[in-house]
């Protein structure tokens, strides 16, 4: 995750801003600079290579002292920065909202996946600039629309019905922030269309998740899609979701956290996110992840939780 201000800077033209991508030499200069504390939140002028991000975002970049940041000296960084600028330049951003726009925290891996989709001749985003723009605006939080199947970050499709598409996510070969853990496995479920869904199609998804992905928890980050993650990674997701939610509240970003369908979401996660929306502390919310919940009535007839061991999936073991 990183703020949009890590990729580009605003240049005032008439009454609105044009956004320009950073080059990696300017960022490199900023990372070596000694900056007064009062100037940490200001864009840095590298003198030689142009404008660089505010020094307060130093930890967002991979350096000898910080391996957890993004690899900004890659071609992919430039491609992602240009993708963001193209999207922002399609909007009218004024002095009143430029700060809020640039403080928006976005998913670096999601944006890299959009670049990968854009460069794939078999993908619809390769052929449609309008759809690519729409997908990018959603990814950077500048659209009220949710991420649906056609505007999704992409991946390998492992399940699809009339209402949902399930993607296997892999970041092993990413350039900006690869996940090199060979055991990493995660999925995302997007809605094919943002409209009411038939119980029949919900039941099909629930059955698929229950029998094929029983080692995973179904959660949401509040953005209109489901994530299927290992139970061992749930606490980490909770920390990230809570931090992003609080950051958005603090900066005044419109943050309509979508709890999604309670019949699909893991019961403990639904309790966690509901508590978070009520304004409780992280500790109070996270306790709900580890509490034994009272089993809910099965909303779907004929979908039993009783299953023989040889019928239970080994995915994620």
Curated annotation (Swiss-Prot):
Enzyme Commission no: 3.6.4.-
Binding residue positions for ATP: 107-109, 188, 221-223, 227
Effect upon mutating residue 188 to A: Almost complete loss of NTPase activity. Unable to induce NSP5 phosphorylation
Outcome (variant: residue 221 to A): Almost complete loss of NTPase activity
Obligatory cofactor(s): Mg(2+)
Annotated consequence of substituting residue 110 to A: 35% loss of NTPase activity
UniProt GO MF annotations: ATP binding; metal ion binding; nucleoside diphosphate kinase activity; ribonucleoside triphosphate phosphatase activity; RNA binding
Gene3D superfamilies linked to this entry: Rotavirus NSP2 fragment, C-terminal domain (3.30.428.20), Rotavirus NSP2 fragment, N-terminal domain (3.90.1400.10)
Active site: 225 (for ntpase and rtpase activities)
Keyword terms, alphabetized: ATP-binding, Host cytoplasm, Host-virus interaction, Hydrolase, Magnesium, Metal-binding, Nucleotide-binding, RNA-binding
Stretches the record annotates as RNA-binding: 205-241
Location of the protein in the cell: Host cytoplasm
Task performed by this protein: Participates in replication and packaging of the viral genome. Plays a crucial role, together with NSP5, in the formation of virus factories (viroplasms), which are large inclusions in the host cytoplasm where replication intermediates are assembled and viral RNA replication takes place. Displays ssRNA binding, NTPase, RNA triphosphatase (RTPase) and ATP-independent helix-unwinding activities. The unwinding activity may prepare and organize plus-strand RNAs for packaging and replication by removing interfering secondary structures.
The name this protein goes by in its record: Non-structural protein 2
Species whose genome carries this gene: Rotavirus A (isolate RVA/Monkey/South Africa/SA11-H96/1958/G3P5B[2]) (RV-A)
Lineage: Viruses, Riboviria, Orthornavirae, Duplornaviricota, Resentoviricetes
């Amino acid at each position: 995750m990183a703020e949009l201000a890590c990729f580009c800077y605003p240049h005032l033209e008439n009454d609105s801003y044009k956004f320009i991508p950073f080059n990696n030499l300017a960022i490199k200069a900023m990372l070596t600079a000694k900056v007064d504390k009062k100037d940490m939140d200001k864009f840095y002028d590298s003198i030689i290579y142009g404008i660089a991000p505010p020094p307060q975002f130093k930890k967002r970049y991979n350096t000898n002292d910080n391996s957890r940041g993004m690899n900004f000296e890659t071609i992919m960084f430039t491609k992602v920065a240009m993708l963001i600028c193209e999207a922002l330049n399609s909007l009218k951003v004024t002095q009143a909202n430029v700060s809020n726009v640039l403080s928006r925290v976005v998913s670096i891996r999601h944006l890299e996946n959009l670049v990968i989709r854009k460069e794939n001749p078999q993908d619809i985003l390769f052929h449609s600039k309008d759809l690519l723009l729409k997908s990018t605006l959603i990814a950077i939080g500048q659209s009220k629309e949710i991420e649906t199947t056609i505007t999704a970050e992409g991946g390998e499709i492992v399940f699809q019905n009339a209402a949902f598409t399930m993607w296997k996510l892999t970041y092993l070969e990413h350039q900006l922030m690869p996940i090199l853990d060979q055991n990493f496995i995660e999925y995302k479920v997007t809605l094919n269309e943002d409209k009411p869904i038939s119980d029949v199609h919900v039941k099909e998804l629930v059955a698929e998740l229950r029998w094929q992905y029983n080692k995973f928890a179904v959660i949401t980050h509040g953005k209109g899609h489901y994530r299927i993650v290992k139970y061992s990674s749930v606490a980490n997701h909770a920390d990230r979701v809570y931090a992003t939610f609080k950051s958005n509240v603090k900066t005044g970003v419109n943050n309509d956290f979508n709890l999604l369908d309670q019949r699909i979401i893991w019961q403990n996660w639904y309790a966690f996110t509901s508590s978070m929306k009520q304004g409780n502390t992280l500790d109070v919310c996270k306790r709900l992840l580890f509490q034994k919940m009272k089993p809910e009535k099965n909303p779907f007839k004929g979908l039993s939780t009783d299953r023989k061991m040889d019928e239970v999936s080994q995915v994620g073991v």
